[in-house]
Amino acid sequence: MFIEEFEIESITSTHLLEVLTREYPEVRSPSIKGAMRWWFRALAGSYFGDDAQKLKEIENQVFGSTKERSRVKISVTPLSSPKRLNLKEFKDKNVGYIWFSINLLGKRGTITHYYPPGSRFRVVLESPSERVIKLATLSLWALVSLGSVGFRSRRGTGSMKIVRASSEVLEDLGLTTEFNSIDEFKDSLKRVLDVTGEILGVKNSETNKSLPSYATLKFSDVEVFGPGKNTWEVLAQFNNSYKEYLRRRIKKYQRIIFGLPRFKLRGVRKDLRRASPLWFGVVEIGGKPYGRIIKFFQSTFHPEVRSKHIVDWNVLSNFDWFISSRLPVTKVWGGWSG
């Protein structure tokens, strides 16, 4: 049995929706496993073009499905207790635009607790297969280093870092849990994608040049900006830039590219859902907080929204130009050539 143990610390506050059967919400194994599956697809999908069926087969071999058991056991133990939500604490932090729904649901009582920055969690991965434990470890690394956890996780909440790892796998794979420079962060992105291909036994072939219908790291842009004086400054800088871009730099109908629902958009049903292809979080580089922006480009935005007039991926990519005019932005990955 291969066992890998990690201690993870929150960089930004982590918010979870209430579960009726619990006194307060917790970061639990199913939520971490679900997030790891997403990032596995983003890594492995970079090698399969638009072959969603093949990607699903590989994913099920690691995480299981309704027809086959998962080959990796994921255990999550909170080492910190959640704190009761006090909306006044966030009132002067200048994050009202990107965290508007936290304020809304907090007032309704749908969100009552959260994990403040500095909260810690233990994550243990177990598998009888060395190949599976490596792929699961890569997925967890990507989740922590590139993604986030919880409600509004694509807008700055739930950013994490690995503070301790009892893991021979990470060392064997040549991945670090601390980034001493932007170049080291950049090299790590290339490394995690290369190693994924090596373990899967596939290459980034010539047939994998067109945009797939699902999100992959290959067809994404990754930028960082900063450093900020503190995490709240980084969050506020993105909040202000994002708000300015959506409200004053693009037309209302063009906002659709940043996710659904959009309740005041003609011709688009209000009940349609589509998670934003733009992920914003905070990453520590050289011990300082940096904003991290990832934009995932796909061939299909939503099966019921096909109009190129409404869905314009250039609106998403042009956000780079806008935020670069306001903040010191460094591109660390550029897989999108559209």
Swiss-Prot record:
Principal subcellular localisation of the protein: cytoplasm
Any one of the GO CC terms: cytoplasm
Pfam families: Cmr1_like_C, RAMPs
Any single biological process term in GO: defense response to virus
Keywords noted in UniProt: Antiviral defense, Cytoplasm, RNA-binding
Source taxon at top rank: Archaea
Location of this chain's protein in the cell: Cytoplasm
Molecular function, one GO term: RNA binding
InterPro entries: Cmr1-like_C, CRISPR-assoc_prot_TM1795, RAMP_III_fam
Keyword Transmembrane recorded: no
Stretches that traverse the bilayer: none
Assembly information from the UniProt record: Part of the type III-B Cmr ribonucleoprotein (RNP) complex, an elongated RNP with Cmr2 and Cmr3 as the base, with Cmr4 and Cmr5 forming a helical core along the mature crRNA (39 or 45 nt in length), while the complex is capped by Cmr6 and Cmr1. The 5' end of the crRNA is bound to Cmr2 and Cmr3, while Cmr6 and a Cmr1 subunit (Cmr1-1 or Cmr1-2) cap the 3' end of the crRNA.
Purpose of the protein: CRISPR (clustered regularly interspaced short palindromic repeat), is an adaptive immune system that provides protection against mobile genetic elements (viruses, transposable elements and conjugative plasmids). CRISPR clusters contain sequences complementary to antecedent mobile elements and target invading nucleic acids. CRISPR clusters are transcribed and processed into CRISPR RNA (crRNA), formerly called psiRNA (prokaryotic silencing) in this organism.
Record-stated family: Belongs to the CRISPR system Cmr1 family.
The protein's name: CRISPR system Cmr subunit Cmr1-1
Source organism (scientific name): Pyrococcus furiosus (strain ATCC 43587 / DSM 3638 / JCM 8422 / Vc1)
Gene responsible for this protein: cmr1-1
